[in-house]
Amino acid sequence: MAAEPNKTEIQTFFKRLRAIPTNKACFDCGAKNPSWASITYGVFLCIDCSGVHRSLGVHLSFIRSTELDSTWSWFQLRCMQVGGNANATAFFRQHGCTANDANTKYNSRAAQMYREKIRQLGSAALARHGTDLWTDSVSTAPSHSPEKKESDFFLEHTQPPAWNAPVTDLSETQQPAPSAESSGLAQPEHGPNMDLLGTSPKASLEPKTSLIGKKKPAAAKKGLGAKKGLGAQKVSSQSFSEIERQAQVAEKLREQQVADAKKQAEESMVASMRLAYQELQIDRKKEEKKLQNLEGKKREQAERLGMGLVSRSSVSHSVLSEMQVIEQETPVSAKSSRSQLDLFDDVGTFASGPPKYKDNPFSLGESFGSRWDTDTAWGMDRMEEKEPEVTVSSIRPVSERVTNRREVESRSSGLESSEARQKFAGAKAISSDMFFGREVDTEYEARSRLQQLSGSSAISSSDLFGDVDGAHGAGSVSLGNVLPTADIAQFKQGVKSVAGKMAVLANGVMNSLQDRYGSY
């Protein structure tokens, strides 16, 4: 048995192997400057991937350090010499093993075949070379060997024969294959003898070259198109750059479309605004012409109100088109219309203004229906001020409204106070019931009737209110016959408050109409 190599020989051997470009990166992850090796596959690994290989077991991968371990055998060195990252990559890809998971990859059929092949080639190299290392006398051969090795290996197994070279070249390269194998084994200075792996697959796959070339031409170009052994990264970067370029072009087109759509929308908006402005100018000129044609008082009123100068739309109302002077007429049937509405005012219909003391209908009588038909309980309504009609000339600016409202209230309160003085001029003392028209006798009469009927088993409304003839005669219905006095009082009070609120709301509507149409 030959002596084992010393530390110097081991360092020289691995220095030559690691100088090859394909061995400068980890076989599994591609990390730079790997310092560990898998003797089973003849590949170089980084420290992380070496730990993964250790976890697989020595029956699948035997790991050693190229820098720390000094007990290498000649068989192990020959396995590293005939192997290499490039040969392992080509073999795994050729047999369709592209998995990244270590368990899947090194338990596959391709890994088993490659382990057996490395063992056979290492044994043959050890038998031929023994303990000889590379010498400087044959250092000129490796310069030609890598080019021939890479070009022959990749082109022969990944592309059809018609693409690689003429038929004469293939026949020429096929014949010296055994001599290349023998020469590679005889001279270990040639580096990791790639021809040993390159020739045997060629001989076995030569009859099926065209079939393999037709099935996997594109995949072989993408995966092994580079000459440095890391073709996958190069091809993926090209594909990513192409996708990025297409994405940039699509983004530019989308931005251009958005800009064009926005520009068209702005142009259409500007055109519509110009058209509307032209229409407004035409309407303004028409209104100015109408204003110039007016005479005297009509023109002064139009200028004072500022109406008719500008028309908002084609259907807007203009005062200048049909301006007429409205003369206020004195209403003749004020009393009759008031008497017709007494019934509705009494039950809570909406009054024309806020509630006043003279509108309080809480005076009690024998029958509310009979009292509503008389004028004695509503004597104060005769002196009520006639409400003026609302016209365009009677509308005043906003600044004068508070003063006008106060004037109306002071005027009504003055009328009430003067009427009360005339009514109670000779009285020494008056009460609130007398002032507001409440009669105490009626209340006393109602209480006396209740006392009389306290012992009876059943009473009717006619017995309670003393309206026997009315119950059986005319058949008229009044609130006094339906609801008690207290409920009627509460009901009327609520209706009066609602009527007051509605009057205020109506006044606000008129003021808003004045504000809106008074600015034109």
From Swiss-Prot:
User: Zinc finger, C4-type: residue spans?
Assistant: 26-49
Residue spans making up a coiled coil are: 242-307
Q: Which SUPFAM superfamilies match?
A: ArfGap/RecO-like zinc finger (SSF57863)
Does the keyword field hold Nucleotide-binding?
Answer: no
The keyword Cell cycle belongs to this UniProt entry's keyword annotation: no
Q: Which domain of life is it from?
A: Eukaryota
Molecular function via GO: GTPase activator activity; zinc ion binding
Q: Which positions bear Phosphoserine?
A: 145, 200, 236, 239, 311, 333, 339, 363, 367, 431-432, 512
Q: Name one GO cellular component term.
A: Golgi membrane
Question: Where on the chain is N-acetylalanine found, per UniProt?
Answer: 2
Its membrane topology:
Peripheral membrane protein
Region of interest: Required for interaction with coatomer: 97-520
Please list where the region (Disordered) is annotated. 159-240
Q: What does this protein do?
A: GTPase-activating protein (GAP) for ADP ribosylation factor 1 (ARF1). Implicated in coatomer-mediated protein transport between the Golgi complex and the endoplasmic reticulum. Hydrolysis of ARF1-bound GTP may lead to dissociation of coatomer from Golgi-derived membranes to allow fusion with target membranes.
According to the record's subunit comment, the protein's assembly and interactions are: Interacts with the coatomer complex. Interacts with C-terminal appendage domain of COPG1.
Tell me what this protein is called: ADP-ribosylation factor GTPase-activating protein 2
> From what organism does this protein derive?
Bos taurus
Q: What is the lineage of its organism?
A: Eukaryota, Metazoa, Chordata, Craniata, Vertebrata
